[in-house]
């Protein structure tokens, strides 16, 4: 089958070059365009974008209202709700450090009824005579604000207090009923104990379980267990009703020779009777003690056996089905459920009972479990049962019957306290075969009875327990559901407050707004977004880490598992994960298997279950119809693998195929196949799908590869991989890092900060308006990496909706570019690549190949103190002028200044209390009138390990406080930006409308003022064109319409500008006591250096051991030195062969590019044909081949020019090129098919003994930078109690000389060194001072004293009342204080 190009080639300067791909499957691109759909859809369902559809918010309001006061005198009703617009845009919220939120307002109606009389217990209402309804005293309706709701950004994140956060989706056990067993672990006998659990969405859990004696118990909320008969009686069932419910009855009729019983085939399967089987005519059919098989039983039935005889004595030991009472004397003969004894048989004869009903309990297929449980507490009444349940859950209270009944009903049968949710009801119905409406989200009596029945059947050996790790039993809770739950909690609190307020307020003066406190809801939402385990600081290292974080699934969090309790089963890969959850991408630590990632094509349905897409197969022919299946549905079908071979009619070539069915692989005929996978890569996540040749790697290394891609730092110049997978452009577009065109149109203007597009409809007929895109320049991400967007388009380009028009960080031509393509050699070099170490060429460092920019934020807060306000100023006490050279007149560092450790970023002084001056100083002050310094330096200094360039400064001045010059300058720059935007918009609008006006006027072909109208228009200003009056009414009407639209758009541009200015002039709300906040952003350049961690995409990670001069690096025959040397021993044991195949394919890619470059360098008419022919060979079997043949010469040259650096390849997951295809490409590039070349030693110029594998590999620089880790201390802070140096880089601490290090010195016998380490170099306070003195004096002698830690230990022992003292010269040295 021919391979295809990953994207149709469009000759745009801003589109990426299509990749040479060997994929056979068809991608469903629609599913891939929106990678954060899971977040967006969930949130939209909660807020209700479409108010007609029931949303989460609307349902909550409707369930809470109406609220009436305790006596029913007034009622508060919900009318409608509305969601406002955010006050500030996303960037402004990050900048100001505030939450990106929208106001929620509800319309409430307050009705007060007319009342005649109000007593303690009831209210008498005035009734309207006409309607017979309660009379209304008055109605008040008002719109009320109930608080702000954090809203989702366009990228699927939330901005909380200026920080971007992500709400991670949670996998949890679905509401419903689950049947399980203890797997024989509870009792030493290994007997299986079966249990059932009904889990609601909200409310009490109900468990049923057997014990070792096969008595059935129940528990509520894991409290003490009680016999299940108590629960059944509390549901209102009597003993006989319980038996009727759980057991079948068999009718026994008396005759002369015994009891006549109906013959039922199923009851005789494998039975051995102790008596002869005799029909009612007395014929012996089967002798006693003969085993009756199912086949024999069926033969007897077919021979006409309807009834048979049971001897009188043989009913002994059976159980009577209902109470037996003598009709004549009303004497109770037997109670329901009693076992029949010989005495009972005699009574049956005595009282002449001709008909009895027996419970169908045979101890084989039907056990007496319910019956035995019933006889534990046979005589307990309905009231006693309620009391027993109440006593377990609310011990120590003595309730009334009504209280107990209300309490029991509230546990499972009232919507306010118990909610199964729609999902729970569907699962219950499905599991138990019920047909109860989905609207009934509480338990019913039928539910409980059917659960007990199914559990008893399990104990009897029928059916199977549930697999709790099956994705049909686990659902995903996404962001909308979490916020809905928090919203409900907030609204319930609000409801209680409203009811409290209603009991004390005067209704005559009350308005709806008086009842609502907006802070209640805001507090609950703030707590969730700030502190919930699932509200996480967004991983913003690079675009991939953003996407992956939003698509993450966690089993941890509230209502989920904990790391400590989670076993192997829940962490393991399950067959139902196929196409739903990635089996590769998961953390390596203690969270392994608990945190996973959604597969590429998977989606989450409205009930929270994960669906995977499949193409429908009809009678062996694969159709283009794509259907999404749930895990539960999938087990019923035969599903073929995407790699199955199809002919040109999409029919399976093979007669028999391997298919997945019910968790197993089976071989079936092609006509039996129901579905086929849409793509081989549908089983993996976004990160894993970016690894080329994934199928050639060990799964452990693939896991590391997908995790380390998320740690890659965006580099100074992005470089898309030569060997990709075809997913790079999709991830880039879905990440939110690039700028996508909102609407189709023509690019009007481009600069470093703005892209202005004149938008049209799809047919380019109707003008829609102006789209202005603000590019993000040198902004700081959550992980201090640099966000910088660069335009790809140029004026005049036509762009379509969702085209990439600007690259972001780690994006190259709209493709994800996390690392660099470098020339690699797999060999050892002087032992410097021992144990995965990496050797790098100095040329790589010199050319800034792996240089990255990191932006650090520093904040200076100016407060109002008790002694007066702090001040930002340039004149700082005791600081010389040279140290202030990079500050402006205000005292704030200039943008563009180069700063290093210890430099002042913001000069600030703080008032200090006046000190008591000595008399001579007072005299000088009196004589000269000089004011002594009454302030102290509290400036913001650059920390010790930072050096870089100031790229931005933000100054926030409290509203009402006078702004400084720097603040005014920054504000003016912002206003200039707004003016620029407004003018751009007006320019585009004017250009379009004046063109349209000119077209209308010129098309009239008339003269105006005795000259041609086109010439006349040139002679007057454009503004005057509107004043031209023509005689044609239709033309005047057209001009009038154009003028109206023109004025409207210009007015709109001005109003948007005015709004922005108003927001800017509004000022900043800062915390209490804060006058001003200055934020300084410093860009730090990190060059590659030894100690930095690097990795490929195949889990091949290592640390740079040495940067070797370029002239010493091994080089190729043409003199090209290699960039990087990797250890070839790192491949076989790790089994990540993908890196070698990538190297070969990269080698072919670059050399094909060089070959194309050589042809281009000598281009003429003959060589153009040669070029076309060569490209035809390169793209052989590709769709692009036909485009190349039909391209014009100019287009062909432009296309070939972009292939100079290498022909981009795609090796999609499970569809990478095979070894013969790689060999063909190497041959085409005139290379050895082994992929190995002769290398020469750069130091001595000799050829190495054997050929070396050389090629191009894509390497990433990870965010484990040596600059952030290496640390040294000479002098620094000490701990207060122990007086030992602090530990850790963040505290500028020292290295701990620990227990084992002391042993090492002991082993060497270095006694004096050891003594120094434990005393003067650590916590001997006196000794430290003395050694400092002796160093100053030049003396080399010192004495060691007692370490402070020893004194601490002595004090602690004394606190335990143990008197510890030092012994010296046979005397005890007590602490003087103690002796005194």
From Swiss-Prot:
The keyword Nucleotidyltransferase applies. It catalyses: RNA(n) + a ribonucleoside 5'-triphosphate = RNA(n+1) + diphosphate. GO terms for biological process: DNA-templated transcription. Keywords: DNA-directed RNA polymerase, Nucleotidyltransferase, Transcription, Transferase. Coiled coil: none annotated. The RNAP catalytic core consists of 2 alpha, 1 beta, 1 beta' and 1 omega subunit. When a sigma factor is associated with the core the holoenzyme is formed, which can initiate transcription. Belongs to the RNA polymerase beta chain family. This is DNA-directed RNA polymerase subunit beta. It comes from Ehrlichia ruminantium (strain Gardel). The lineage of its organism: Bacteria, Pseudomonadati, Pseudomonadota, Alphaproteobacteria, Rickettsiales. The gene is rpoB.
């Amino acid at each position: 089958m021919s391979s295809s190009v990953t994207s149709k080639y469009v000759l745009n300067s801003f589109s990426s070059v299509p990749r040479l791909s060997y994929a056979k499957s068809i991608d469903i691109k629609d599913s891939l365009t929106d990678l954060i759909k899971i977040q967006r859809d969930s949130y939209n369902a909660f807020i209700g974008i479409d108010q007609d559809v029931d949303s989460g918010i609307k349902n909550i309001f409707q369930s809470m209202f109406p609220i009436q006061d305790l006596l029913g005198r007034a009622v508060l009703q919900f009318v409608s709700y509305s969601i406002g617009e955010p006050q500030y845009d996303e960037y402004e919220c990050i900048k100001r450090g505030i939450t990106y939120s929208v106001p929620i307002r509800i319309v409430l109606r307050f009705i007060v009824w007319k009342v005649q009389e109000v007593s303690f217990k009831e209210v008498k209402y005035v009734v309207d005579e006409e309607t017979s309804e309660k009379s209304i005293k008055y109605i008040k309706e008002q719109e009320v604000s109930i608080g702000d709701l954090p809203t989702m950004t366009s990228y699927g994140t939330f901005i909380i207090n200026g920080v971007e956060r992500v709400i991670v989706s949670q996998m949890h056990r679905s509401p419903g009923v689950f049947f399980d067993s203890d797997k024989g672990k509870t009792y030493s006998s290994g007997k299986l104990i079966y249990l059932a659990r009904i889990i609601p969405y909200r409310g009490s859990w109900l468990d049923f379980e057997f014990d070792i004696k096969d008595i059935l118990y129940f528990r509520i909320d894991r409290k003490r267990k009680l016999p299940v008969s108590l629960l059944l009686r509390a549901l209102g069932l009597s003993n006989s009703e319980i038996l009727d419910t759980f057991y079948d009855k068999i009718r026994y009729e008396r005759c002369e020779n015994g009891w006549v019983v109906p013959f039922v085939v199923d009851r005789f399967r494998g039975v051995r009777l102790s008596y002869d089987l005799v029909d009612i005519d007395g014929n012996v059919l089967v002798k006693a003690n003969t085993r009756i098989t199912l086949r024999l039983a069926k033969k007897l039935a077919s021979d006409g056996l309807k009834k048979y005889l049971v001897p009188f004595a043989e009913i002994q030991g059976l159980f009577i089905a209902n109470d037996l009472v003598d009709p004549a004397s009303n004497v109770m003969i037997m109670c329901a459920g009693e076992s029949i004894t010989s005495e009972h048989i005699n009574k049956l004869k005595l009282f002449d009972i001709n008909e009895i009903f027996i419970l169908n309990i045979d101890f084989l297929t039907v056990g007496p479990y319910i019956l035995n449980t019933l006889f534990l507490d046979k005589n307990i009444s309905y009231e006693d049962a309620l009391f027993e349940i109440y006593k377990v859950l609310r011990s120590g209270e003595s309730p009334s019957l009504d209280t107990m009944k209300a309490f029991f009903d509230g546990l499972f049968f009232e919507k306010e306290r118990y909610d199964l949710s729609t999902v729970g009801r569907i699962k219950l119905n499905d599991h138990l075969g019920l047909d109860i409406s989905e609207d009934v989200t509480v338990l019913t009596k039928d539910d409980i009875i059917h659960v007990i029945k199914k559990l008893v059947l399990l104990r009897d050996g029928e059916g199977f327990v549930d697999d709790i790790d099956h994705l049909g039993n686990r659902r995903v809770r996404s962001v909308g559901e979490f916020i809905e739950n928090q919203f409900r909690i907030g609204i319930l609190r609000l409801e209680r407050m409203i009811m409290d307020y209603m009991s004390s307020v005067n209704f005559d003066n009350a308005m709806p707004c008086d009842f609502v406190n907006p802070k209640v809801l805001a507090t609950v939402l703030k707590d969730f977004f700030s502190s919930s385990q699932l509200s996480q600081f967004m991983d913003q290292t690079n675009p991939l880490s953003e996407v992956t974080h939003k698509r993450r699934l966690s089993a941890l969090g509230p209502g989920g598992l904990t790391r400590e309790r989670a076993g192997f089963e829940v962490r393991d890969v399950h067959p139902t994960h196929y196409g739903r959850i990635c089996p590769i991408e998961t953390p390596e630590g203690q969270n392994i298997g608990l945190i996973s990632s959604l597969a590429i094509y998977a989606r989450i349905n409205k009930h929270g279950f994960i669906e995977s897409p499949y193409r429908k197969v009809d009678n062996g022919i694969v159709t283009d119809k794509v259907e999404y299946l749930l895990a539960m549905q999938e087990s019923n079908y035969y599903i073929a693998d995407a790699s199955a071979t199809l002919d040109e009619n999409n029919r399976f070539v093979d007669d028999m195929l391997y298919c997945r069915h019910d968790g197993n692989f089976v071989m079936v005929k092609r006509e039996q196949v129901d579905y086929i996978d849409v793509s081989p890569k549908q089983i993996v996540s976004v990160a894993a799908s970016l690894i080329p040749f994934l199928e050639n790697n060990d799964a452990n290394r693939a896991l590391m590869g997908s995790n380390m891609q998320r740690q890659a730092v965006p580099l100074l110049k992005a470089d898309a991989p030569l060997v990709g997978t075809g997913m790079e452009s999709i991830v880039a577009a879905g990440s939110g890092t690039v700028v996508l065109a909102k609407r189709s149109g023509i690019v009007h203007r481009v600069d470093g900060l703005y892209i202005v597009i004149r938008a049209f409809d799809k047919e380019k007929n109707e003008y829609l308006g102006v789209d202005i895109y603000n590019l993000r320049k040198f902004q700081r991400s959550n992980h201090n990496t640099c966000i910088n967007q660069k335009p790809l388009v140029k004026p005049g380009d036509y762009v379509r909706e969702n085209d990439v028009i600007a690259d972001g960080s780690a994006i190259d031509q709209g493709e994800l570019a996390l690392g660099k393509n470098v020339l690699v050699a797999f060999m050892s070099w002087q032992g410097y690549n021992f144990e995965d170490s990496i050797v790098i060429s100095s040329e790589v460092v010199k050319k800034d190949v792996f240089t990255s920019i990191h932006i650090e934020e520093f904040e200076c807060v100016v407060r109002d103190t008790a002694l007066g306000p702090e001040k930002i100023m340039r004149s700082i006490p005791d600081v010389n002028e040279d140290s202030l050279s990079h500050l402006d007149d205000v005292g704030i560092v200039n943008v563009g200044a180069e700063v290093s450790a210890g430099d002042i970023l913001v000069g600030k002084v703080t008032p200090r209390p006046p000190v008591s001056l000595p008399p001579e100083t007072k005299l000088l002050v009196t004589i000269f009138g000089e004011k002594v310094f009454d302030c102290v330096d509290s400036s913001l200094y650059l920390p010790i390990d930072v050096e870089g360039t100031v790229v931005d400064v933000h100054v926030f001045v409290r509203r009402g406080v006078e702004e400084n010059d720097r603040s005014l300058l920054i504000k003016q720059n912002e206003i200039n930006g707004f003016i620029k935007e407004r003018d751009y918009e007006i320019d585009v609008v004017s250009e379009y409308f004046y063109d349209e006006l000119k077209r209308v006027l010129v098309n009239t072909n008339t003269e105006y003022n005795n000259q041609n109208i086109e010439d006349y228009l040139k002679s007057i200003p454009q503004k005057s064109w509107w004043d031209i009056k023509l005689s044609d009414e239709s033309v005047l009407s057209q001009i009038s319409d154009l003028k109206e639209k023109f004025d409207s758009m210009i007015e709109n541009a001005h109003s948007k500008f005015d709004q922005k200015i108003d927001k800017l002039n509004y000022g900043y709300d800062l915390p209490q006591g804060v006058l001003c906040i200055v934020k300084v952003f410093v860009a730090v350049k990190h060059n590659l250096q030894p100690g930095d961690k690097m990795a490929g995409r195949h889990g091949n990670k290592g640390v740079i051991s040495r940067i070797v001069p370029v002239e010493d690096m091994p080089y190729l025959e043409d003199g090209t030195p290699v960039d990087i040397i990797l250890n070839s021993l790192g491949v076989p044991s790790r089994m990540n062969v993908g890196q070698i195949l990538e190297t070969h394919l990269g080698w072919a890619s670059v050399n094909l590019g060089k070959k194309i470059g050589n042809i281009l360098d000598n281009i003429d008419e003959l060589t153009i044909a040669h070029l076309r022919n060569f490209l035809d060979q390169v793209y052989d079997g590709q769709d692009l081949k036909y485009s190349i043949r039909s391209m014009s010469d100019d287009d062909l040259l432009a296309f070939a020019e972009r292939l100079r650096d290498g022909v981009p390849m795609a090796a999609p997951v499970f569809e990478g090129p095979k070894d013969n295809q790689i060999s063909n490409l190497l041959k085409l590039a005139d290379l050895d098919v082994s992929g190995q070349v002769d290398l020469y030693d750069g130091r001595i110029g000799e050829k190495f003994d054997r050929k070396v594998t050389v090629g191009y590999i894509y390497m990433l620089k990870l965010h484990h930078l040596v600059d952030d880790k290496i640390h040294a201390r000479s002098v620094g802070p000490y701990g207060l109690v122990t007086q030992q140096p602090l530990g850790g880089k963040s505290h500028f601490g020292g290295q701990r000389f620990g227990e084992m290090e002391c042993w090492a010195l002991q082993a060497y016998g270095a006694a004096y060194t050891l003594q120094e380490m434990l005393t003067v170099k650590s916590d001997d306070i006196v000794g430290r001072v003395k050694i400092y003195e002796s160093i100053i004096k030049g003396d080399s002698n010192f004495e060691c004293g007692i370490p402070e830690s020893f004194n601490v230990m002595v004090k602690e022992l004394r606190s335990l009342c143990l008197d510890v003292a030092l012994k010296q010269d046979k005397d005890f040295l007590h602490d003087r204080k103690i002796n005194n």
